[in-house]
């Protein structure tokens, strides 16, 4: 059996963070307390593999982490706990990732015993509030300068430093990691 190694460990619970893939039902069924995940958004917003990037690209002013039940459907399980944080103009993917990583670790430490004791009551996600944050494609790394300055600014921040937004200049690919919005500009 492909899950024999996990079965032999006899886990009470399986915890994942930033896994970004479907977990097979056979694995979800192993631990008696189920499987839980730390997801880097305030679910049901931004289900999927790139919630941090999309929270910045889409211009959110806040995001957070959600402790959630893992089920067969991606990021759709019951929510057990959440913590939020502000997104500022100084945030990039890297800075927000690091802050959410710390918040997620704290959320697990504060809630794991309660979860294992059955004292956390999960809240179903409102399917009418669901948005999706798919993985970033190569095409989405390319900047579109026909968009507003705010949209380009957010796009650069959301992809900085990995994978980095890019544009073509003199037939060369240029990576953009930082930008600044200039409110008014004149050549004269």
Where are these regions (language model features)?
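Donor/substrate-binding cores of folate-linked one-carbon enzymes
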Residues: 13-132
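Residues within well-ordered alpha-helical secondary structure of globular protein domains
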Residues: 8-9, 102, 158
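Short amphipathic alpha-helix with an adjacent loop that forms part of the alpha/beta core around
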Residues: 2-10, 29
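Internal anion-binding site segments
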Residues: 127-188
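Hydrophobic alpha-helix-in-membranes signature
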Residues: 10, 43, 162-164
């Amino acid at each position: 059996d492909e899950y024999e190694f996990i079965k032999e460990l006899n886990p009470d619970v399986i915890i994942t963070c930033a896994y970004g893939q479907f977990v097979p039902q056979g694995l979800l069924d192993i631990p008696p307390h189920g499987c839980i995940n730390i997801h880097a958004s305030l679910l049901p917003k931004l289900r999927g593999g790139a919630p941090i990037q999309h929270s910045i690209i889409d211009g959110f002013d806040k995001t957070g982490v959600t402790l959630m039940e893992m089920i067969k459907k991606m990021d759709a399980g019951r929510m057990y706990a959440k913590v939020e944080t502000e997104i500022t103009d100084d945030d990039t993917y890297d800075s927000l990732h690091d802050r959410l990583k710390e918040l997620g670790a704290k959320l697990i430490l504060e809630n794991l015993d309660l979860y294992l004791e059955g004292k956390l009551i999960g809240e179903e996600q409102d399917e009418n509030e669901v948005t999706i944050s798919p993985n970033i494609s190569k095409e989405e790394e390319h900047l579109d300068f026909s968009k507003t300055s705010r949209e380009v600014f957010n796009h650069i921040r959301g992809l900085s430093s990995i994978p980095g937004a890019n544009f073509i200049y003199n037939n060369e690919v240029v990576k953009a990691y930082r930008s600044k919005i200039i409110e008014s500009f004149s050549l004269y």
